[in-house]
C-alpha cells in the first residue's frame, strides 16, 4: 500500500479592521428586562375626586401685556424675588440686571415672527455680578436701579457661562404706570 502525501500551498488572507470601522449590527437586545407598564401612584394622575387640587388663576389673555417668564403671575414681592435669585445662584448662574425705558413688554417692531428674538434690546445695569453668592447683593443692585430709573422696566437674568446661554429672565420691577 502506497501512501502519498501531497502538499499544496494554502493561501489565507487576513482582513484587519481599520481603526475607524465599527462592529457589525448583531440585532436588538431582549426586551424581557424592561417593564411593559409603568405604574404611577401620584394622586394627580388618579381619575377621581379623591384629592383636592389648588390652582392659581392666571391673568386674562386679552388686555394684559406679556412681559417675561413669570408675567402671568402677580408681581413678586421682595421675599419671592429673593427666592428666585437664590435659585439662580444655586444653579451656578451669574445674575445680571437689565432695564428698558420704553418697551418692557413683547412687541413686534423689527421682527414679525413670535419668539424671544422680537426686536427688544435691553440695557445692562452695570456689569454682570460675577462671583455673587448672596441674593441680598442682587436685591441691593435692584434697589439702586429702581432709584436711578423709576420709570423703567427692570429684569433679572441668570447667565450660564459654561453653556454661554441665558437660562432665566424675569421682570423684577415695573413702572408705577403698569
Swiss-Prot record:
Keywords: Calvin cycle, Carbon dioxide fixation, Chloroplast, Photorespiration, Photosynthesis, Plastid, Transit peptide
Keyword Chloroplast: yes
InterPro entries xref list: RuBisCO_ssu, RuBisCO_ssu_dom, RuBisCO_ssu_N, RuBisCO_ssu_sf
GO function terms (MF aspect): ribulose-bisphosphate carboxylase activity
One protein family per Pfam: RbcS
GO terms for cellular component: chloroplast
Signal peptide annotation: none
Lineage top rank: taxon: Eukaryota
Localization of this protein: Plastid, Chloroplast
Main localization category: plastid
GO BP annotations, alphabetical order: photorespiration; reductive pentose-phosphate cycle
Transit peptide feature, positions: 1-54
Entry's family note: Belongs to the RuBisCO small chain family.
Additional facts recorded: The basic functional RuBisCO is composed of a large chain homodimer in a 'head-to-tail' conformation. In form I RuBisCO this homodimer is arranged in a barrel-like tetramer with the small subunits forming a tetrameric 'cap' on each end of the 'barrel'.
Subunit text: Heterohexadecamer of 8 large and 8 small subunits.
Known function: RuBisCO catalyzes two reactions: the carboxylation of D-ribulose 1,5-bisphosphate, the primary event in carbon dioxide fixation, as well as the oxidative fragmentation of the pentose substrate. Both reactions occur simultaneously and in competition at the same active site. Although the small subunit is not catalytic it is essential for maximal activity.
Protein name per UniProt: Ribulose bisphosphate carboxylase small subunit, chloroplastic
Amino acid at each position: 500500500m502506497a501512501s502519498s502525501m501531497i502538499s499544496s500551498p494554502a493561501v489565507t488572507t487576513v482582513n484587519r479592521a481599520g481603526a475607524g470601522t465599527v462592529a457589525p449590527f448583531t440585532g436588538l437586545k431582549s426586551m424581557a428586562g424592561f417593564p411593559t407598564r409603568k405604574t404611577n401612584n401620584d394622586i394627580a394622575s388618579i381619575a377621581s375626586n379623591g384629592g383636592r387640587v389648588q390652582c392659581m388663576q392666571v391673568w386674562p389673555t386679552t388686555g394684559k401685556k406679556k412681559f417675561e417668564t413669570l408675567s402671568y403671575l402677580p408681581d413678586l414681592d421682595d421675599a419671592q424675588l429673593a427666592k428666585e435669585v437664590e435659585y439662580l445662584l444655586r444653579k451656578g448662574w451669574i445674575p445680571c440686571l437689565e432695564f428698558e425705558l420704553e418697551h418692557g413688554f413683547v412687541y413686534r417692531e423689527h421682527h414679525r415672527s413670535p419668539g424671544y428674538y422680537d426686536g427688544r434690546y435691553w440695557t445692562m445695569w452695570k456689569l454682570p455680578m460675577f462671583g455673587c453668592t448672596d441674593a441680598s447683593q442682587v436685591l441691593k443692585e435692584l434697589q439702586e436701579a429702581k432709584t436711578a430709573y423709576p420709570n423703567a422696566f427692570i429684569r433679572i437674568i441668570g447667565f450660564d457661562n459654561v453653556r454661554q446661554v441665558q437660562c432665566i429672565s424675569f421682570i423684577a420691577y415695573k413702572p408705577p404706570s403698569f
